[in-house]
């Protein structure tokens, strides 16, 4: 699969970052989504260094907040004419019940 536009959530480390490296190495345009802009910049630098692919963008978003999901979707629509693949990788774990500022329980 090459020359596709692929969005990967949770793409700044772990499985998401490794997937982004492999997908970028195939020549795809990759949108990395994460909460931490510093980790996003480092991820893009690493992917570019390893693959030579510079068709990378970072989108900052906390996917536990609906308002940020809405903002992210607008940013992606404005950046790309189409998205071929959405790889939903973002996740987290907590031992305690966590309620977001929007009143949603994180799972």
Q: For each predicted feature, which ranges?
A:
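Rossmann-fold NAD(P)H-dependent dehydrogenase/reductase core
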Residues: 1-107
């Amino acid at each position: 699969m090459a020359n596709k536009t692929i969005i990967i959530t949770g793409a700044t480390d772990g499985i998401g970052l490794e997937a982004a490296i492999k997908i970028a190495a195939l020549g795809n345009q990759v949108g990395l989504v994460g909460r931490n802009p510093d980790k996003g910049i480092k991820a893009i630098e690493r992917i570019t260094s390893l693959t030579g692919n510079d068709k990378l963008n970072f989108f900052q978003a906390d996917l536990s907040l609906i308002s940020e999901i809405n903002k992210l979707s607008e940013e992606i629509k404005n950046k790309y004419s189409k998205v071929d693949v959405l790889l939903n990788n973002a996740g987290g774990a907590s031992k305690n019940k966590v309620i977001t500022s929007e009143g949603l329980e994180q799972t």
